[in-house]
Amino acid sequence: GEQVLKGILVPHAGYVFSGSCAAWAYKLIAEAKFAKTYVILCVDHYKRCKGVSTVMDDFETVFGVAQVDKVMVQKLVDKGLVNVVDDVKEHSLEVQLPFLQHACMDNLQNLKILPLIVNDVSRIKDIAKEFGDDVCVIISSDLTHFGEDFNYVPFRYNIKKSVAEQDKNAMRFISDLDSDGFLCFVERGKITICGKKAIALGIEMFRVLDVVDVELLSYYTSSEVMHNDSNFVSYAALRFK
């Protein structure tokens, strides 16, 4: 039968940069068993939301309406675990929706999403416990942002190799489902992984979902697209089973 896919980690840059990386992961969503709810864990790039936030309003894209799982939202709100905001203008979420809808083309009418904008990690274990195994988790995060543009220049030599090595170490914590280790590693090195809090919540959800197998599907940097070696962002696609 169809494989159960517990989740993916995908980048959220413009499609021209990270689209081909994300496509590897969404291909697996298309092939896997259709989930009751797709939980999309996002970054709050504009620091507008406190704690962990979500919305009640459905989203509209070129493929039509993506319905928010309002029952699940209400459950999380009632338990004081998330708060509802009016409007999420957040590209780390918006970039994922057409990909997800396209992957679920046969089930568009039944597609339900639960976007969570993660700005705080104090209650991620409690939030994770609220989910059963009928969900698929989508973590929306790029990896290292390197260069003066990002105020992050820890390496002067062998830059690409050093960034790749560091990303590999970060991904090892993710694969080991060690959210504390991951956050400590990122904080200690002041590493510019924008979705670190979303990743930490994702890890806790994958622990609850009994993930046993994590695979790296794709990894590259924007410098391979733009040929700019002084400022670049690295992207990875991971799948969790």
Where is each model-derived feature located?
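Active-site histidine-anchored catalytic micro-motif
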Residues: G1-E204, V208, S222-M226
